[in-house]
Amino acid sequence: MELYLDTSDVVAVKALSRIFPLAGVTTNPSIIAAGKKPLDVVLPQLHEAMGGQGRLFAQVMATTAEGMVNDALKLRSIIADIVVKVPVTAEGLAAIKMLKAEGIPTLGTAVYGAAQGLLSALAGAEYVAPYVNRIDAQGGSGIQTVTDLHQLLKMHAPQAKVLAASFKTPRQALDCLLAGCESITLPLDVAQQMISYPAVDAAVAKFEQDWQGAFGRTSI
């Protein structure tokens, strides 16, 4: 199982990489724009924040296959082993095929349906990213889409992995993992929620209180 953070916040990545067993960091154009740092600045910073380890993902901006390939080459000039995110449009599928032929790893993104995701894997994408919460927001079932996609990839494109994205709650992420999803990417707020349990803090405080009462200190 691979756990990623979906952010361009360098400080947060450095802090959470100390706590979480991170496989890397994913970004998209909206995330990069919100951080107001250009790719050639923020991507090396994110790489350094992870201690020079882990996989980085960044997305193309062009809308034609040829343009997407050119964008991919630009991204690879910044981070040599970056995974290139390509929207799974008709042109995106063509670009994924072209990048596969060049040995450049890709992630098929903006996936709203299992069939769409399967096509990106068959075209050569190493990862496929269904948008769980956005599918729910459109009246679908994000978890069912992940379940269906996982089964399709297992049967027809076992070399590819589901990398589920677009979460609003930890429960959505856990349901994806229970459905067999091999990897997830979490926004910072959801990642923080996974380690924020008021009942745990209360339990630790009670342990300290009892120990202090018995031994007059809080150390062993």
UniProtKB/Swiss-Prot annotation:
Gene Ontology BP annotations: fructose metabolic process; ketone catabolic process
Catalytic activity: beta-D-fructose 6-phosphate = dihydroxyacetone + D-glyceraldehyde 3-phosphate
One Pfam family named in its UniProt record: TAL_FSA
Primary location: cytoplasm
Top-rank EC class of the record's enzyme: lyase
Subcellular location: Cytoplasm
InterPro entries associated with the record: Aldolase_TIM (IPR013785), F6P_aldolase (IPR023001), TAL/FSA (IPR001585), Transaldolase_3B/F6P_aldolase (IPR004731), Transaldolase_AS (IPR018225), TSA/FSA_arc/bac (IPR033919)
Activity regulation (record text): Inhibited by glycerol, inorganic phosphate and arabinose 5-phosphate.
Active site: 85
Summary of the protein's practical applications: Is an interesting tool in chemoenzymatic synthesis for the construction of chiral complex polyhydroxylated sugar-type structures. The use of hydroxyacetone (acetol) as a donor compound allows access to various 1-deoxysugars. Can also be used for the synthesis of a broad range of iminocyclitols, that are potent glycosidase and glycosyltransferase inhibitors, from dihydroxyacetone, hydroxyacetone or 1-hydroxy-butan-2-one as donor substrate, and a range of acceptor substrates.
pH effect on activity, per entry: Optimum pH is about 8.5. Active from pH 6 to 12.
Subunit structure as annotated in this protein's UniProt entry: Homodecamer. Five subunits are arranged as a pentamer, and two ring-like pentamers pack like a donut to form the decamer.
Free-text function comment from the UniProt entry: Catalyzes the reversible formation of fructose 6-phosphate from dihydroxyacetone (DHA) and D-glyceraldehyde 3-phosphate via an aldolization reaction. Can utilize several aldehydes as acceptor compounds in vitro, and hydroxyacetone (HA) or 1-hydroxy-butan-2-one as alternative donor substrate. Is also able to catalyze the direct stereoselective self-aldol addition of glycolaldehyde to furnish D-(-)-threose, and cross-aldol reactions of glycolaldehyde to other aldehyde acceptors.
Listed name of the protein: Fructose-6-phosphate aldolase 1
Lineage, top ranks: Bacteria, Pseudomonadati, Pseudomonadota, Gammaproteobacteria, Enterobacterales
Gene: fsaA
